[in-house]
Amino acid sequence: GSSGLIAMPRV
């Protein structure tokens, strides 16, 4: 959940 570029879970 750092940028919106890569699909990262905000957990």
UniProtKB/Swiss-Prot annotation:
Main location: secreted
Record carries keyword Cytoplasm: no
A Gene Ontology cellular-component term: extracellular region
Top-level taxonomic group: Eukaryota
Pfam families: Periviscerokin
Localization in the cell: Secreted
Chain positions with Valine amide modification: 11
Any Gene Ontology biological process: neuropeptide signaling pathway
InterPro entries linked to this entry: Periviscerokinin (IPR013231)
Keywords assigned: Amidation, Neuropeptide, Secreted
UniProt record similarity statement: Belongs to the periviscerokinin family.
Function: Mediates visceral muscle contractile activity (myotropic activity).
UniProt name for this protein: Periviscerokinin-3
Organism: Cryptocercus darwini
